[in-house]
Amino acid sequence: MAVKDSLGDRMKEYYEDRAKTYLTRRTPVIIRLDGKAFHSFTKHLKKPHDKIFHDTMNSTMEYLCKNIQGCKFGYTQSDEITLVLVDYDKLETDAWFGYGVQKMCSISASMATLAFNTYFKKYRDEFLDAVSAFQDFDLEADYLEALRKCVDVGALFDSRCFNIPTEEVVNCLIWRQQDATRNAIQMLGQCNFSHRELHGMSCNDIQDMLMLQKDINFNDMPTDYKRGTCCYKKEIPCSDRLVGYKTEWVIDKDPPIFSKDREFVEKWVYIKEC
């Protein structure tokens, strides 16, 4: 027979449980994670596009997609990750932590922090091995020091979660993708022009400056740099199975422009409910 803990029960009932909030069930949920003070964290990394940082964000997104119950779609750009969750595949489908806001935010932020720091060190070590093989220590000395500091300091993420109507999910992703494109243009501009030269310039102005003065066409940049990266489940051919395929999470570095292909996102949330 369990011993009644009157003090513990009172603390939970009167105080701890009173602060708990829950999102609405059977309605899409967005979890958005942001790197804390990443402007400082990435200050001495390569610009406009650091491969180690970019690969780390992609792997962190994939880790979250694989390990957060109900996640259907992930999207990352810059230092942020957006996840789309549903809990209505079937009538009996459970929600992640019952859609408790405190649990979802604290644990997703912890997961992102753990994954990011693990992958960043992994990719830094692989880069260090490559530099060692080609004896490029002098050429990469400053960059190696920047990577060392990043590993020593470590990264942190914050997280927020919220319900969103099914028809608004794609609009949320359009918003973040448009932000990705704007950030990419501005970063490319900052790498080629002074702050004074860019003052008051729109993204279209910056693209024109890059083309006319530097012979750089923004449209020629890698798709994932311009639009971000996605993660979702896909059927993969498999020769060792009778059915001939298996379902795996994949990282898509060539996503469409969401505003021109809404179905690309909507198919993950418009599920026939049971």
Language model feature labels by segment:
Residues 1-274:
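Regulatory and interdomain segments flanking nucleotide-handling catalytic cores
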